[in-house]
Structure formats: C-alpha cells, structure tokens
C-alpha cells in the first residue's frame, strides 16, 4: 500500500508538470481579442512571459490583434497560424522608449519598436501569418535630422541576441526600419515575405554588427534599401550567407553601408534576382530603384572577402556601385574620429544587369585610400547609352566626404564602367551591350595600378577605343583588344 500511495503521489506531481511545461500558449486564453480594435499588449505579453518560464510556443491564432511593444524573452517562439495578423497600435504611447545598454549610431533617436528582444537567447518568430506595423500612422513631420527619425517605431528590433530565427512570416508596413538585427550571433532568416512601403526609411532588413548569419528564400519589396549590412557599433558584420532571394527596392536592393564603423568581412551573396518594385510611388529614391548592388565604406572600417555571384539586376538606374570614401562620421559623439577605411579582396561574377539610366557603373576609391584587389568577371551589362557629348576631357570630382550613392558623380565618362583609385583590378569576360549610340567608351580607368583587363566584348558600340586608360594608370595589361560584335 505504501508503494501504491507513493506512485499516486508521483503521478499527481508529474501530470501537471508534463501538461504545463512544453504546452502552447494561445494568446486568446490570456485575454487577447481578435477584433482589430482592442489593444491586447498586456495579454500577449503574459503569454510570452509564461512561454519563457514554462516552455511551449506562443500561438497567435487567426484574427486581427492590435498591440503595442512586446518584449521577447529567452526561449520564446511566436507562432502565427494561418490568417493571423499582429497589428501595431497607431498610438505612440503604446511604444515605450527602450535602450539597449551599448552605444551605436542612432542611439539618441532609436527608442521604440513593435517587437523588441534585447540580450536574450533562443527566440523564433515563424508561421503563416502577418506582422503589420501600420507605419503610415506615424508620419514624418520635419526634414531636420535626427528629429525626422524620432517617434517612428521599428517592426522588429533584435539586439545582442543569440540563436535567432525568423521564418516564413510576412512582415509589412513599418514606420521606420522593418527589422533591425544589431550585434546578434547565429541569426537565420528564411522564407519571409516583405512589403514595406508605408513610410520613409522603410528598409527591408538591416544586419548590423552581426555574425554567423544565413539569409535565404526572401521575397521582399521595400521603399528604401533592401538587404542592408551596417556597422553602427564597434562590431564587424561577418560570416554571412545570402542566397535565393528576390528583391525590389526604390533605393539599393543589396547594400553595404553607409555606416561602416567596424566594417564587413566574409560575406557570400549568390543566386538572387533584383527586379522592379511593385509600388510605383517612391517616398525615397526612384520607382525603378537607384542601385542594384552597392558596396560602401565611408566611415572607417574594413570590407574584405566579399563574394557576389549569379545575380540578375533588372531595372535600377545603376546596377553596380563600389565606393571607398571618407565621410568619417563617428558612431557616437564621444567616439574617436574614424580613419580612412579599406576595401580588399572583392570578387563579383555572373552578373546579368539591365540598367535604366545612362549614368554607368563605378568602382572608386580616393587618392589616399585606394581599393585593393577587386575582380569582376563573367558579367553582362545592358546599357541604355544615348549620350552624344564628348566627355573625354571631363575631370570627375573626388567628393570623398559626400554621402555615397551610385548617382553621386552624375553622368560618368564611360557608359559601362568607370574605375578610379584602385590597385589590382581584374576585369575578365565582360559584355557591354549598348542600346543607343554613345560617345563614351565602355570602360575608363583612372589612377589604376596593377591587374588585367581581358576578354571584353561590346555590342552596338561604334567607338574604336572602347577601353580608355588614362596616363596616370600603370601596370595594367589589356589583352586581347575588345571585340565589337555589333
């Protein structure tokens, strides 16, 4: 009898344990209302807190749930059932000001987000539903910096976290950046759908000082920049893979910068398509997009070991822009002045690009900071052309302190590629197809030391000298002469 009593006691103790730990937590059980009216922040936060303590997922069922800021905790999974929508409150008072405990560029005006995770581990956001920030409710009221960035909550703000997964969810309409991941490790973003055209500064995603990152199978359309790598702290963004994405942007679809305090290292981007945005009204940039691929170091920092391959760029004004400048902006006021940064070991191949502007692509350093080691191979650029003026004697301004943008120099002296202040460049097996007659050559090299240009083909061109090497360039070997297949 004693043994039977003991067994019963153990069963009574174990049954509630096994029922509670690992059980899912439906937010409606905690009082959340799926009416699209009631602000259910407290109820949803209770479900998150219980999930963190006891295990199990937080379930957002079908329906429209209004919420203010939610704080994710350790070991939390937000799971969205089909037709579930988490809608950001339109009241700024529902987004408390929050700090992260470290300095970064923007820490004096970035305070608020719909979902926040700070210094937590093992968090997941996944499912078949939607998170919608309703960002149009927070209009920009001034052009003055930084005030124009204030009082516009992010959608996701994930800082100093490890083991983060965002999967299969739809993200829409933030008031500011859509998803900011800063100083995170082991980050996986897979299969999400993004449409972000509700406000200014509507980036698709910002990866900032993170390492060990995998981004795959994204279909995204943003008013501002697309997949964006930043370095706004003393942490480098490194060990990153991006693959199999379809991206649209009114600005730069794939972008490194502008903030580059520590820099970027060991990044692979492959098998992606950049296409025109479905949104025709551009709050920022241009409907067709500014640039397909933009690599920028202007606030110090390094950029090294970057491999980009098999990309279709269809529509932006400029397909490719690489820039080493010297804006030298501190990431906070008391930080030391950043030195000139560096760009080295960049490999770009398999680009098929259709430009919508005659500006041309460019790879440019500055006189005191040259790009070192860049390769562009097996690419095809369709260029609009149509410029009749003679630009052979045009002296391009340096503009080393200017905000970096592929359109910053205006019309370039080459219809295909302008290269300046570079040591060791290799251009191999590149086709430039000119749609209209143009007075400019396909390639201009200005202050280049070392490297090779070979197997260049031009289609539709009528100039004999399709490659122009200025007298200040040396050790540059060109073979064979470019072929004109027009």
Predicted features and spans:
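Sec-dependent signal peptide recognition
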Residues: 5-12
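Single conserved hydrophobic/aromatic residue that forms the stacking wall/gate
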Residues: 477-486
């Amino acid at each position: 009898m004693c043994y039977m009593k003991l067994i019963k006691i153990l069963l009574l103790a174990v049954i509630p344990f096994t029922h509670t730990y690992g059980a899912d937590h439906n937010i409606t059980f905690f009082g959340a209302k799926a009416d699209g009216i009631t602000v259910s922040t407290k109820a949803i936060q209770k479900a998150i807190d219980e999930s963190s303590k006891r295990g199990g997922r937080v379930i957002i069922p079908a329906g429209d749930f209004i919420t203010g800021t939610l704080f994710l905790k350790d070991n939390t999974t937000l799971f969205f059932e089909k037709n579930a929508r988490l809608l950001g409150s339109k009241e700024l008072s529902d987004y408390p000001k929050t700090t992260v405990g470290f300095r970064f560029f923007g820490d004096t005006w970035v305070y608020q987000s719909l979902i926040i995770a700070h210094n937590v581990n093992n968090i997941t956001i996944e499912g078949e539903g939607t998170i919608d920030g309703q960002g149009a409710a927070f209009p920009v009221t001034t052009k003055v910096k930084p005030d124009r960035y204030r009082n516009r909550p992010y959608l996701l703000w994930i800082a100093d976290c490890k083991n983060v997964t965002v999967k299969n969810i739809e993200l829409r309409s933030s008031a500011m950046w859509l998803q900011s991941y800063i100083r995170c490790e082991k980050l996986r973003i897979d299969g999400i759908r993004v449409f972000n055209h509700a406000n200014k500064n509507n980036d698709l995603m910002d990866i900032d000082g993170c390492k060990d990152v995998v981004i795959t199978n994204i279909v995204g359309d943003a008013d501002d920049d697309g997949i964006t790598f930043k370095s706004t702290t003393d942490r480098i963004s490194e060990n990153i893979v991006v693959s199999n994405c379809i991206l649209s942007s009114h600005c730069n679809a794939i972008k490194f910068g502008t903030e580059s305090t520590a820099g970027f290292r060991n990044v692979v981007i492959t098998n992606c398509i950049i296409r025109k945005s479905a949104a025709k009204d551009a709050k920022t940039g241009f409907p067709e997009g500014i640039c397909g691929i933009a690599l920028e170091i202007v606030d110090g920092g390094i950029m090294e070991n970057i491999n980009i391959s098999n990309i279709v760029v269809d529509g932006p004004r400029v397909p490719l822009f690489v820039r080493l400048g010297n804006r030298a902006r501190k990431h906070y006021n008391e930080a030391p002045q950043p030195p000139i940064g560096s760009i080295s070991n960049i490999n770009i191949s398999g680009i098929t690009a259709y430009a919508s502007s005659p500006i041309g692509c460019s790879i440019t350093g500055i006189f005191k900071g040259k790009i070192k080691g860049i390769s562009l191979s097996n690419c095809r650029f369709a260029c609009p052309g149509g410029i009749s003026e003679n630009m052979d004697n045009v002296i391009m301004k340096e503009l080393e302190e200017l905000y970096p943008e592929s359109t910053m120099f205006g019309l370039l002296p080459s219809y295909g590629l302008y290269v300046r202040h570079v040591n060791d460049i290799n251009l191999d097996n590149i086709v430039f197809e000119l749609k209209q007659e143009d007075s400019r050559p396909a390639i201009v090299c200005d202050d280049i030391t070392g490297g090779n240009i070979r197997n260049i083909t031009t289609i539709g061109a009528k100039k004999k000298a399709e490659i122009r090497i200025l007298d200040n360039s040396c050790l540059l070997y060109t073979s064979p002469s470019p072929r004109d297949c027009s």
